[in-house]
Amino acid sequence: KIDPLDFFCRLSKSNLAPEAFLIKDKNYSVISCSPETLIEKKGRSILTKPIAGTLKKNNKLNKNKALQYFRKNIKETKEHNMIVDMERSDLSRICVPGSVKIKKEKTVEEYKDLFHYVSLIKGKLNEKAKTIDIVKSMMPGGSVIGCPKISTLNLLNKQEKENRNIYTGSFGYIKFNGDMRFNIIIRSILNFKNTSEISVASGVVIDSNANHEF
């Protein structure tokens, strides 16, 4: 049996993540150390920070050599570029034409056990874009679906035998002024009275190696 608050506090100390959260209800709890920002909207400015491309830390390699290997990895680069293109396209549907820009491209973020490729994409919302338009355009996040999004979703619905539940969904808030922030629910535990559920996945492209992904 898990004490949600205690577990979340210990998890936050050992694996701090920018989009971590805890939901505690009498029937269930969600404990998450998600690192990924899907939507951050302030006024007419909107951004997304897709994460795609991962390297597990290796005690045999120092940090500099590990990063050199990471940056030369064609598969991880292709995966990240694909997701960046898709998220840029999603933003373009709701933003002023020409305003969507990649502000930071393929920077490396370091976590306790991993390195990730992260990009920052920003745009200026068009005047007609409403909250529902933003949600429809950006959700579900591209990094947990793949490209092209709609056909991939249809394929996943046929192939996946069980519903993902909260996994790869989003958690966040919408303010009264329309500002919002949402993450992508990964690295999370869905905890019930007597059971706990953890979902995992990997991004697969043509250059993927099954053993490496596992």
Show which residues each predicted segment covers.
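Extended alpha-helical targeting/anchoring segments
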Residues: 1-214
